[in-house]
């Protein structure tokens, strides 16, 4: 289990990621910040940190910011929580996941629906394996700079 100190560090990293992603998106499109838990509890519980105007489709898409890129450039897709319940990768209602690296200050993004299909297919054909974290969470690690579905935010 994570200690209280580890949880605080993770929370601060997450807030830094949310801020960086929302600021970067705000430079190119309209963004609705949904990160205030008290004001947007329902959105937050669905894994939504913001909505943004997708300039390609001219629709409002939902986004979730993660600050879970390791120094090695790998990002973690949480399939199951330690308690056996589905992890954020399976439960988020977001359209897009934005990953922020606290090490490089880079932002990467991917379509959650496309990535779910990709992960499902790779698990079925055994070309990737699940990892069990010390926390008890189960998921897969993917390199942000080599995966065909993950794009770097300019």
Question: Can you annotate each of these PLM segments?
Answer:
Residues 1-27:
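Interdomain/boundary linker segments immediately adjacent to catalytic/signaling cores
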Residues 43, 55-56, 90, 100:
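Generic structural signal for beta-strand residues in well-ordered domains
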Residues 25, 50-71:
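Conserved catalytic cores of phosphodiester-cleaving nucleases, focusing on short active-site segments
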Residues 8, 22-53:
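A short acidic/basic microdomain associated with nuclease active sites
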Residues 51-53, 66, 80, 139, ...:
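Intrinsically disordered, low-complexity regions of eukaryotic proteins
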Residues 4-11, 29-36, 65-108:
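Catalytic cores of nucleic-acid endonucleases
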């Amino acid at each position: 289990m994570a200690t209280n100190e580890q949880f605080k560090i993770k929370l601060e990293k997450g807030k830094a990621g949310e801020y960086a992603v929302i600021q970067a998106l705000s430079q190119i499109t309209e963004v609705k910040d949904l990160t205030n838990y008290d004001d947007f509890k329902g959105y937050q519980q669905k894994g939504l940190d913001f909505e943004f105007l997708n300039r390609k489709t001219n629709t409002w898409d939902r986004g979730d910011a993660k600050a879970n890129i390791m120094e090695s450039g790998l990002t973690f897709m949480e399939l199951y929580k330690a308690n056996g319940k589905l992890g954020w990768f399976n439960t988020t209602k977001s359209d897009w996941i934005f990953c922020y690296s606290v090490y490089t200050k880079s932002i990467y993004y991917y379509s959650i629906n496309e990535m779910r299909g990709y992960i499902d297919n790779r698990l079925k054909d055994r070309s990737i394996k699940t990892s069990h974290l010390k926390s008890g969470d189960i998921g897969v690690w993917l390199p942000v700079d080599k995966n065909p579905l993950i794009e770097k935010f300019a």
